[in-house]
């Protein structure tokens, strides 16, 4: 008589926010669908970024702000993988961990959400001095460059909290990731999808990044069913660009990528916080050279003065 030994439960780490859980439960359901004989459990954790809500993100620093507790869980063998919004995952991961999978990207654009009194308007037609809420230096710098007539104010909290602040007239409009609103079934709140000519999106925006222990072949084989090669190549180029610029999540660096067959085009941008200087350029390469493409574009922007802008920002934040 043979005794069957069931495979161990796979434990998935997640932040506790509504958006994080929607994303993590989607991953759990997809894995369960492909591997019905396996058990997948979700373990929720609170990250530093979830706890500190009264300080602007740029002032806290960003080394693992939304990821460290999840990473500690994997390194301590309490969890086997962690689901992140890829834009929150630092480009340099702790020793022993790796980016195991990039899921199919949804809309990576930024979205304008208006207070009811401004319905029908867009960024260009909002009145002089209108208060726009954003916690992202990338959005702030680009929008200041294009719309100097607007006023910008920090906004923190989860998506529902930010929308509540908008609806209670603390802001005339706020900027959020379209992907988050779509995943929360709130796409009806989007008043304008901001085109890349105005605001290049964050590195990895719109994709989920699933982190796991390096060399964990069992978990990596499970994650293959979630991998989207087009999204991965685009995001690898974007992350290499950010890494080469030595920028984190809280610096004004934006990107846009486009795949045409095997040809990958990357546009990258670095801007000063006051919106006075904006350096932008584009390069293309075969998709198999995605990481080199990102590095090359970063070096090209450095030659045009991007390094000086970033050094000023880091010095100002007290982290230079």
UniProtKB/Swiss-Prot annotation:
GO:BP terms for this protein? Answer: chlorophyll biosynthetic process; heme biosynthetic process; protoporphyrinogen IX biosynthetic process
Catalytic activity reported = 4 porphobilinogen + H2O = hydroxymethylbilane + 4 NH4(+)
Cofactor(s) recorded in Swiss-Prot or TrEMBL: dipyrromethane
Which GO terms of the molecular function aspect are on file?
hydroxymethylbilane synthase activity
Keyword Transferase present in the record's keywords: the answer is yes
S-(dipyrrolylmethanemethyl)cysteine-modified residues are 249
Q: How is the cofactor bound?
A: Binds 1 dipyrromethane group covalently.
Family recorded in the similarity comment: Belongs to the HMBS family.
What's this protein's function? Tetrapolymerization of the monopyrrole PBG into the hydroxymethylbilane pre-uroporphyrinogen in several discrete steps.
What's in the misc comment field?
A: The porphobilinogen subunits are added to the dipyrromethane group.
Assembly and interactions? Monomer.
Task: Indicate what this protein is called per its UniProt record.
Answer: Porphobilinogen deaminase
Organism, scientific name: Synechocystis sp. (strain ATCC 27184 / PCC 6803 / Kazusa)
């Amino acid at each position: 008589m043979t005794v069957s030994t069931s495979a161990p439960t796979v434990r998935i780490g997640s932040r506790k926010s509504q958006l994080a859980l929607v994303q993590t439960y989607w991953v759990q359901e997809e894995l369960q669908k492909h591997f019905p004989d396996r058990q997948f459990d979700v373990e929720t954790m609170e990250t530093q970024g979830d706890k500190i809500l009264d300080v602007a993100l740029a002032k806290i620093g960003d080394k693992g702000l939304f990821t460290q507790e999840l990473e500690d869980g994997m390194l301590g063998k309490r969890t086997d993988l962690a689901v992140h919004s890829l834009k929150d995952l630092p480009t340099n991961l702790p020793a022993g961990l790796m980016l195991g999978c990039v899921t199919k990207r949804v809309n990576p654009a930024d979205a304008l959400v208006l207070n009811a009194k401004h319905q029908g308007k867009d960024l260009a037609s909002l009145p002089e001095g209108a208060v726009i809420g954003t916690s992202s230096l990338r959005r702030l710098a680009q929008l200041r460059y294009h719309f100097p007539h607007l006023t910008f104010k920090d906004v923190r909290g989860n998506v529902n909290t930010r929308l509540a602040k908008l609806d209670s007239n603390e802001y005339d409009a706020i900027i959020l990731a379209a992907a988050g609103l779509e995943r929360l079934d709130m796409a009806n709140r989007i008043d304008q999808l901001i085109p890349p000519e105005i605001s290049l999106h964050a590195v990895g925006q719109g994709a989920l990044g699933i982190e796991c222990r390096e060399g964990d072949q069992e978990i990596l084989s499970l994650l293959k069913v979630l991998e989207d090669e087009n999204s991965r190549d685009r995001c690898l180029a974007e992350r290499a660009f950010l890494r080469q610029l030595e920028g984190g999540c809280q610096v004004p660096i934006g990107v846009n990528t486009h795949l045409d067959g095997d040809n990958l085009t990357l546009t990258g941008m670095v801007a000063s916080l006051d919106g006075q200087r904006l350096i932008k350029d584009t390069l293309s390469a075969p998709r198999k050279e995605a990481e080199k493409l990102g590095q090359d574009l970063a070096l090209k922007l450095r030659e045009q003065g991007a390094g000086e802008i970033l050094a000023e920002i880091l010095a100002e934040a007290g982290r230079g």
